[in-house]
Swiss-Prot record:
UniProt KW Isomerase keyword: yes
Alphabetized UniProt keyword annotations: Carbohydrate metabolism, Cytoplasm, Isomerase
This protein's encoding gene: rbsD
Pathway: Carbohydrate metabolism; D-ribose degradation; D-ribose 5-phosphate from beta-D-ribopyranose: step 1/2
Record's protein name: D-ribose pyranase
Coiled-coil segments on the chain, per record: none
Top-level EC class as recorded in UniProt: isomerase
One of the record's GO molecular function terms: monosaccharide binding
Stated family: Belongs to the RbsD / FucU family. RbsD subfamily.
UniProt: substrate binding residues: 28, 106, 128-130
Ranges annotated as spanning the membrane: none
Length: 139
């Protein structure tokens, strides 16, 4: 049995196969998932698992250098927005690098998910709780 924090075999496999600048998306329960992207559906019921809990586990396994958020999150979901920014700041300290955060429209974010290696669906039921993570390198 795997000893690490991330136990989900599909997510673990995707992260292990990422190269520099490859992307994965973590989304709320309503984010449309492109038919060509690998769909990893974790949603059990409303709020389970939460977006933040999935983000916390994924970022413990994945080296991050960039993040894309829908600009609408600022006004429509300030709590999740602040939790994301706090997580990114902590991750910068742990990784020893800067993480670029870009804000794009929700429609552009949905289009951009087409380039993700995988889209992880959570049970999150709050608006604009979506992020695209860009992989960095550990050296």
């Amino acid at each position: 049995m795997k000893k690490g924090v991330l136990l989900n075999s599909e997510i673990s496999a995707v992260i292990s196969q990422l190269g520099h600048t490859d992307q994965i998306t973590i989304g709320d329960a309503g984010l449309p998932i492109p038919s060509l992207a690998q769909r990893i559906d974790l949603a059990l019921t409303q709020g389970i698992p939460s977006f933040i809990s999935v983000l916390n586990v994924v970022t413990q396994e994945m080296q991050i250098e960039a993040a894309f958020l829908a600009e609408e999150i600022i006004g429509h979901n300030p709590l999740i927005h602040q939790l994301i920014l706090t997580q990114i700041k902590e991750l910068e300290k742990q990784q020893g690098n800067s993480i670029t955060v870009d804000y794009i429209s929700h429609n552009v974010l949905k289009e951009k998910t087409k380039h993700s290696r995988a889209v992880i669906r959570t049970g999150e039921h709050s608006p604009y709780a979506n992020i695209i993570l860009g992989a960095g390198v550990t050296f």
